[in-house]
Amino acid sequence: MRFTILFSLILSLPVSPAVIAGQGQIEFSAVIDQSMPQQEPRESKIYIGDGRMRTDITVNGKTMIQIVDMKQQTAYMLDPAGQSYMVRKAGPGEVMPGGASVAAKDANPCAGMQNLGCTRLGVEDVNGRPAEKWEMVNTSPGQSGKMIVWLDQERRIPVRQSLPDGSTMEMHLIGRETLNGRDTEKWEMTVTRPGGQKYVVEQWFDPALKMNIREERPGGFVSEFRNIKVGKQPADLFTVPSDYKEVSIPQGGGAEAGQGGEH
């Protein structure tokens, strides 16, 4: 069975599992529309539950499902056609704040996360907004590194980041807009690469949902939530069916999982 292509598409969705690691996350479901030049529009479905997130995506008639359980720090990739699944640990990089609100004011954003430690360095002004400055250290084998994150004290989103490779990110609040009937804040994110190259991403943050519901990236990439339905999500959406068989993750992220080839 071939997991890799569809798995990469799910990872490209504008939702980080960080969204479900925060305090008081609202449960809801939504459709995500994605479009980019010279490619067919893509539609996926997302479900946000109690500390868990599920994403369904169909490409060329093949559906894949990803379930992330942040309480257990575990991610599952399901192949309904083959009735099989892969399982892995949800790494620190997946639960760092990014486009989603995190812990309550002054709370340690790394609390409960394996191989990730945070040290509070104080409060600084970032584009006119008070932000907590945190040092985050990843101690995972082969992935050690340190980054500095400034968390907006009101929204609990990262408004500035300094990454180990020298890249930086900075957010600036543009204003407030109504999008699909929901009150949002429009933010402009500027990313600077180590060589000095810059690009800008526009994001529409929904304070009630504590996450972005629209994003526009360079090159014409647009992603937007629609048909948002707030409410308790069924627990069985976030469990692996008992008749599914576990297969191994391919070495080096190869195209095939397990030993049986493509189903």
List where the protein language model places each region.
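Beta-strand-rich interaction surfaces with strong enrichment in secreted/lumenal proteins
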Residues: 43-44, 121-123, 174-176
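Bacterial N-terminal signal peptides
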Residues: 4-16
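Short secondary-structure junctions
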Residues: 117-122, 246-247
